[in-house]
Amino acid sequence: MAILCTTTSPAEKEHEPKQDLEKDQTSPLIFNPSLLNLQSQIPNQFIWPDEEKPSIDIPELNVPFIDLSSQDSTLEAPRVIAEACTKHGFFLVVNHGVSESLIADAHRLMESFFDMPLAGKQKAQRKPGESCGYASSFTGRFSTKLPWKETLSFQFSNDNSGSRTVQDYFSDTLGQEFEQFGKVYQDYCEAMSSLSLKIMELLGLSLGVNRDYFRGFFEENDSIMRLNHYPPCQTPDLTLGTGPHCDPSSLTILHQDHVNGLQVFVDNQWQSIRPNPKAFVVNIGDTFMALSNGIFKSCLHRAVVNRESARKSMAFFLCPKKDKVVKPPSDILEKMKTRKYPDFTWSMFLEFTQKHYRADVNTLDSFSNWVITNNNPI
């Protein structure tokens, strides 16, 4: 996805088109923070190229706040969102209606999970080619530029069937003793899905289409929830918690803990977004960029680590139903006349990023070329 910063992005020099990522397993390595931190130097697999290593001092990004409780939100918010999303795709939402106690419980259980011994976490080990499960620095999937993190990802389906996919995942994968985890994260994902639909109404108004259009498009969704843990690192200037990338999904809703780490590439420089416990960080993903025909930007971002404190965050990736055809609404196409991206389904894009391509600044463009070149049927 190379729309916002194609010529100056540090990630562009290392993007890996048309590579079978499942075969990149030449130097398997176990990421165990408690053991790695006893070493004076981090393994070479975690050291990033000089041009991609984190900067010491960077400015703070001026991110607009969207107050969802304000009666004027449907009047002023679309203009503010449009301004942010045509430039970098990031904004904050406050007074969002999500229970503070639910957020606190989700953070508490996330900390409890990552504090478990490695063997316990590996019961949920992600399988090759899949997007969900426990992943320790993507070891086994990649062999270079490994991120200094561990994650737990799981699917959420909002299909009006009353299914409890998240709750079932924890019980089936980790055992009945994780029933409370399943209940909390099921409720959290449902809250994130509802919040996403509210934001979709504002995005529709921002783009000049019916406010119900995108809400209806995502009413049923096959989304992904991810818990992120970035342990302290003895040499944080050599590595990254998450490398530069654009999210392939449609919309990301992120809640950070109190530790700085999120950085966005805007105006040819990295800028940070300060943690705010009262706010969710929202950003546009590649799929919604395609839905807007390139009007709204999916922006390059990354996560850095530090020597003193662990950082944790929770990311909800809103995605359409896997068989839903992604194409801009007619209102947008009538104004722009030309299509920037081919029709595709989320299942096609997800497979591309899991099996053929390591997400970076060029993901959407590379995927579009892949679809056209291979004449992939929808």
UniProtKB/Swiss-Prot annotation:
Enzyme Commission number(s): 1.14.11.-
Listed GO MF terms: gibberellin 20-oxidase activity; metal ion binding
Comp. bias intervals (Basic and acidic residues): 11-25
Binding site for Fe cation: 245, 247, 301
InterPro entries noted in UniProt: DIOX_N, IPNS-like_FE2OG_OXY, IPNS-like_sf, Iron_ascorbate_oxido_reductase, Oxoglu/Fe-dep_dioxygenase_dom
Catalytic activity: gibberellin A12 + 2 2-oxoglutarate + 3 O2 + H(+) = gibberellin A9 + 2 succinate + 3 CO2 + 2 H2O; gibberellin A12 + 2-oxoglutarate + O2 = gibberellin A15 + succinate + CO2; gibberellin A15 + 2-oxoglutarate + O2 = gibberellin A24 + succinate + CO2 + H2O; gibberellin A53 + 2-oxoglutarate + O2 = gibberellin A44 + succinate + CO2
Reported tissue expression: Expressed in inflorescence and developing siliques. Detected in seeds, roots, cotyledons and leaves. In seeds, specifically detected at the rim of the embryo and the outer integument.
Superkingdom of origin: Eukaryota
Cofactor: Fe(2+); L-ascorbate
UniProt-listed SUPFAM superfamilies: Clavaminate synthase-like (SSF51197)
GO BP annotations, alphabetical order: gibberellin biosynthetic process; response to gibberellin; response to red or far red light
Family: Belongs to the iron/ascorbate-dependent oxidoreductase family. GA20OX subfamily.
Protein name stated in the entry: Gibberellin 20 oxidase 2
